[in-house]
Amino acid sequence: MFDLAIFENMFFWAIINFLILYLIYRKFFFKKVTAFMEKRSKMIQEQLDFAAKSKEEAIKLKEEYENILSQAHAKANEIVQNAMIEAQKQADKIIEDAKLEANKIIENALKQLDIEKKKQINELKNQFVSIALLAASKVIEKNLNTEENRKIVENIFDEAGVA
């Protein structure tokens, strides 16, 4: 039935076959496979290193760009602030110039008004003198009493339109 001797013999030859195949594979294939695996492992490691380096550079660039961007925002804010300050200065200057111009106009108007007032006063004085001379000449012509002189002067003023 079952012969153990045959089984032991087959087992022996199987081990021998396995060792021979192992030596052949080792001689011809394992070195190539090991070299290929090492080469592949090295290439993968290089790619991982390159990816890590690229990631670090990307992070550095991102930080640089964020720094540049924040500086640009700060510069823009500074420019806006300076522009607002300058605009306020110009607005204040325009307002001050307008006030000065308005004061000059008012001053000129007051001078013109004063000149016109003096002119009117002189004209009234001249009219008053004319009226007084006219009244005096009429008083002298009639040489009446004081009451009559007063009435004559009042009549002359009424005729001249002076109240």
Swiss-Prot record:
GO terms for molecular function: proton-transporting ATP synthase activity, rotational mechanism; proton-transporting ATPase activity, rotational mechanism. It is found in: Cell membrane. It comes from Caldicellulosiruptor saccharolyticus (strain ATCC 43494 / DSM 8903 / Tp8T 6331). PANTHER family: ATP SYNTHASE SUBUNIT B, ATP SYNTHASE SUBUNIT B', CHLOROPLASTIC. F-type ATPases have 2 components, F(1) - the catalytic core - and F(0) - the membrane proton channel. F(1) has five subunits: alpha(3), beta(3), gamma(1), delta(1), epsilon(1). F(0) has three main subunits: a(1), b(2) and c(10-14). The alpha and beta chains form an alternating ring which encloses part of the gamma chain. F(1) is attached to F(0) by a central stalk formed by the gamma and epsilon chains, while a peripheral stalk is formed by the delta and b chains. Belongs to the ATPase B chain family. Disulfide bonds: none annotated. F(1)F(0) ATP synthase produces ATP from ADP in the presence of a proton or sodium gradient. F-type ATPases consist of two structural domains, F(1) containing the extramembraneous catalytic core and F(0) containing the membrane proton channel, linked together by a central stalk and a peripheral stalk. During catalysis, ATP synthesis in the catalytic domain of F(1) is coupled via a rotary mechanism of the central stalk subunits to proton translocation. The chain crosses the membrane at residues 4-24. Its main location: membrane. InterPro entries: ATP_synth_B-like_membr_sf (IPR028987), ATP_synth_b/b'su_bac/chlpt (IPR002146), ATP_synth_F0_bsu_bac (IPR005864), ATP_synthase_B_chain (IPR050059). Pfam families: ATP-synt_B. CDD domains: ATP-synt_Fo_b. Keywords: ATP synthesis, Cell membrane, CF(0), Hydrogen ion transport, Ion transport, Membrane, Transmembrane, Transmembrane helix, Transport. It comes from the Bacteria. This is ATP synthase subunit b. It is a single-pass membrane protein. One of its GO terms (cellular component) is proton-transporting ATP synthase complex.
